[in-house]
Amino acid sequence: MPSSSSDPIGPWFIAAEALGEYIGIRFGRVAPGDNTPEWIFLRHTDVDGIGGMADLLRRRGAEIPRLPQIKHPSAPSAFSLLRSMPKYLRPRHPARWRPLEGERRNSTHSDPPPAVAWHIFDEPESTQIRRVCRKAGVTINSFLVKHLTKAIRPSLEDESSVVPWMIPVNVRGKVDLGRDTANHTSYVGVRVRSYETVRDVHRNIYEALGRGEHWANWQAYQFSRFLPFRVKKSMLAQGKATSEWYLGGFSNLGDWDPESRITRPECQGGWLFAPPVLRCQLLGAGCVTFQNRLSLTLQVHPELSVNPEVPAAWVQNWIKEIEIDLASVLSEPVAHPHPRLVA
């Protein structure tokens, strides 16, 4: 039986909003035959990524009876939090960026980040990516995180830096918040080193899950319900609201409607998704597979850059790294257009 609980995540996003952060989760739909996304933003106080995707599809007439459930067998445990406490107490060492093109701008709670780029693979390309990951015995998450990190490294002052990512973990099936679209999301951190392979990244993610780091972070958020609002704001402002500093968040909403049973016109096309960006987490990378087409979306916090060419270059590099990996395994490389961006 899933444990009953209340949402411990929403109050943190309310505190972030009070600090001027935009807390909308970015979703997008590119209608068939169109090249311009219809952007939709849902507050992270109300839904998480999976919940938001389900909510949007349901509102457009799709039947989504049951949301994805956690697959990893580790059980919730307070001991995992005790074991992780030293990690919370370590000093934070954010990476330094090389100068990026374009201006920076203060974040406001009312304006979405203007610097965003995206790409949607067609069905054969998406199938190739799944096939290569299956052959290598790795997840699509591990594959994409490794190549995203390599794509961004040239923009860091020290290209050999260890790059930490926050990777959300869906805890539905072991936690019940009453409403299935609510914030059923914890996270693990994965630190990607320049010399590591996709298999190394895959192993590191699963070792973190095996240690129960997602349950440690979930328990930490549960205990944080007793913190005063001003303390939450202070911790966010100091970058201490997570177990360590992260370059950004990488979130995969998984595979939706692979049998293409959803036929409502309002749901058709390619779907996009990116998690929010915060001052303590400057990049938001998201992917989702809808009706066998994988999409990539990358947005940048405005205090890093408001120039959409910045994430567009990173997405272009990301696709290139994916293509190189596919070409090393498959006889025919993936052909791809330039990534889309929003000015």
Enumerate the language-model features and the residues they cover.
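Amphipathic alpha-helical recognition patches that constitute DNA-binding helices
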Residues: 51, 73-76, 80, 139, ...
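Helix N-cap and loop-to-helix transition residues
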Residues: 77, 122-125, 139, 197, ...
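Short, exposed beta-strand "edge-strand" segments with a Pro/Gly-rich flavor and a Y/T-containing core
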Residues: 72-74, 114-120, 136, 193-196, ...
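Non-catalytic, low-complexity flexible loops and terminal extensions
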Residues: 1-23, 54-128, 317-343
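Gly/Ser/Thr-rich phosphate-binding loops and adjoining beta-strand/alpha-helix segments
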Residues: 24-39, 108-172
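Bulky hydrophobic/aromatic packing residues
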Residues: 46, 101-106, 118, 128-129, ...
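Acyl-thioester-dependent acyl-group transfer interface
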Residues: 1-36, 40-50, 66, 154-343
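Non-transmembrane alpha-helical segments in soluble domains
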Residues: 54-57, 130, 149, 202, ...
